[in-house]
Curated annotation (Swiss-Prot):
Motif Bipartite nuclear localization signal per record, residues: 158-175
SUPFAM superfamilies membership: Hepatitis B viral capsid (hbcag)
Gene symbol of the encoding locus: C
Biased composition annotated in UniProt, kind: Basic residues: 149-177
Name of protein: Capsid protein
RNA-binding keyword on record: yes
GO MF term list: DNA binding; RNA binding; structural molecule activity
Function of the molecule: Self assembles to form an icosahedral capsid. Most capsids appear to be large particles with an icosahedral symmetry of T=4 and consist of 240 copies of capsid protein, though a fraction forms smaller T=3 particles consisting of 180 capsid proteins. Entering capsids are transported along microtubules to the nucleus. Phosphorylation of the capsid is thought to induce exposure of nuclear localization signal in the C-terminal portion of the capsid protein that allows binding to the nuclear pore complex via the importin (karyopherin-) alpha and beta.
Family: Belongs to the orthohepadnavirus core antigen family.
A GO BP entry: microtubule-dependent intracellular transport of viral material towards nucleus
Length: 183
């Protein structure tokens, strides 16, 4: 069965795979962030959002995986085998959890649309040959300020004419008004 945990959120495993593995913070840091920002909502018996539910599930699954890792560490006598299991969990499963936690925390923090726009813009940036792309990758926290997305069906905003300067005002008065408008 091919299950994509991001499908219902408009994303995909492939879209997140454009971000390099070292982009994602550690699971511990992500869990601490989720707890610091959303503890009340995550511990609430109320349903808050699908992102909260996904974070709850990921947190519970990570806890169970750590219990299994502890059991393996205690019960697997061969150090080489133990290292292989620990390495597999950290590299493969750890990355999947880091991606999952990052995605849902980011959606709650910045909004799902912003995160999806970021993933698409990063994917375009990373696939563009270095000679033709800007030197710096897009940054999620600045995306809402710099991204212009035109939705279908919306007419462009009308431009309002600039205010006309009244000739009867003295230059001193005009300067003070321009200072006010800069603030």
């Amino acid at each position: 069965m091919d299950i994509d945990p991001y499908k219902e959120f408009g994303a995909s495993v492939e879209l997140l795979s454009f971000l390099p593995s070292d982009f994602f913070p550690s699971v511990r840091d992500l869990l601490d962030t989720a707890s610091a920002l959303y503890r009340e909502a995550l511990e609430s018996p109320e349903h808050c959002s699908p992102h909260h539910t996904a974070l709850r599930q990921a947190t519970l699954c990570w806890g169970e995986l750590m219990n299994l890792a502890t059991w393996v560490g205690s019960n697997l006598a061969d150090p080489a085998s133990r290292d292989l299991v620990v390495n597999y969990v950290n590299v493969n499963m750890g990355l999947k959890f880091r991606q999952l936690l990052w995605f849902h925390i980011s959606c709650l923090t910045f909004g799902r649309e912003t995160v999806l726009e970021y993933l698409v813009s990063f994917g375009v940036w990373i696939r563009t040959p270095p000679a033709y792309r800007p030197p710096n990758a897009p940054i999620l926290s600045t995306l809402p300020e710099t991204t212009v997305v035109r939705r279908r069906g919306r007419s462009p905003r009308r431009r309002t004419p600039s205010p006309r300067r009244r000739r009867s005002q003295s230059p001193r008065r005009r300067r003070s008004k321009s200072r006010e408008s800069q603030c």
